[in-house]
């Protein structure tokens, strides 16, 4: 196991994780179109219906063979594929990689409860049926060290193809929005999220910018001290009152709380 984990780390380091070839500009409500391939670990998780595949969630490529997404994005009754290197949905731009997912290669956290999203553990891993080919449009995400907590106001970006407004349309092109981190002390206040937020989550936004339906499972991208980007969050839920409700920031599964589970799942499969 230790050998495997070391090799995974070496793969990430050798590929230059978290360093997009196309720098991001300084679904996503009131966001903006992302620079093409500026979040090259962003994936589109798609499910099959009536003979065609449809975007349902985002995700992050964390090794050439594994994607990190949300537990609520996964249903064992569905057939999935992952699209890497995507920018504009429905348009073949030449850099996409479409990779099928085998039914037995969906790994949802064992403590995830689909009837209680606020209970936490909304995280899953998807094993690709073949390895991703890394390049300008497809690169690996860096993950944060286990246990790392971002400070209040840390500047992070959500990215995805989620709805542009509550009950609004899905965008064709990848969107991004700046969502400053809201620390647990603030996010758990009674007039914010209260008891719905756990310490294994991270909040970000809470004003006019937020995630929305279709962004689920995608990354919260945060700058690290070494100049790389790290995926600190997996998009989990927003308020039932609307995607951009005041004092209801987007809630993410905190990746640094699940590093051990991620490493063990990859090592054992």
UniProtKB/Swiss-Prot annotation:
UniProt-recorded Gene Ontology molecular function terms: serine-type endopeptidase activity
Signal sequence coordinates: 1-16
GO terms for biological process, alphabetical: proteolysis
GO CC annotation: collagen-containing extracellular matrix
UniProt superkingdom: Eukaryota
Keywords: Disulfide bond, Hydrolase, Protease, Serine protease, Signal, Zymogen
Described function: Efficient protease with alanine specificity but only little elastolytic activity.
Protein's UniProt name: Chymotrypsin-like elastase family member 3B
Source species: Mus musculus
Organism taxonomic ancestry: Eukaryota, Metazoa, Chordata, Craniata, Vertebrata
